[in-house]
């Protein structure tokens, strides 16, 4: 089974709409990266219904640690930096998108995170 994980910073106290927008940015950017490096995972994910899981971290440090580990594992990913026009400071790191990829590969990095 394939999935995509989106990790959101919970400490920024973004509104629901802002979090949804950041999650969408992370999802799309990670998907575009996956198309370049893992077309078979993208095809599998598309055929299985495009499962997504949204998780949370409580700091920029945690978000960057996840991003680092995702890169070490060689998974398609994205790191989202907000422009700061609304609720957060310019340049704030808000989210990481991971995959699509096989669930077991993603869970190696996300297994200790809680659902948003």
UniProtKB/Swiss-Prot annotation:
Record InterPro entries: Pep_tRNA_hydro_II_dom_sf (IPR023476), Pept_tRNA_hydro_arch (IPR034759), PTH2 (IPR002833)
MF GO annotations: peptidyl-tRNA hydrolase activity
Keyword presence, NADP: no
Subcellular location field: Cytoplasm
GO biological process, one term: translation
Keywords carried by this UniProt record: Cytoplasm, Hydrolase
Family: Belongs to the PTH2 family.
Name the UniProt record assigns to this protein: Peptidyl-tRNA hydrolase
Organism: Methanococcus maripaludis (strain C7 / ATCC BAA-1331)
């Amino acid at each position: 089974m394939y999935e995509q994980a989106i990790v959101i910073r919970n400490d920024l106290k973004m509104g629901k709409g802002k979090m949804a927008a950041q999650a969408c940015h992370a999802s799309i950017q990670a998907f575009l990266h996956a198309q370049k490096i893992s077309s078979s995972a993208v095809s599998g994910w598309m055929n299985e219904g495009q499962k997504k899981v949204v998780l949370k971290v409580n700091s920029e440090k945690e978000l960057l640690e996840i991003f680092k580990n995702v890169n070490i594992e060689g998974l398609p990913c994205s790191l989202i930096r907000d422009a700061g026009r609304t609720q957060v400071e310019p340049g704030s790191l808000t989210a990481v998108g991971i995959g699509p990829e096989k669930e077991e590969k993603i869970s190696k990095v996300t297994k200790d995170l809680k659902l948003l």
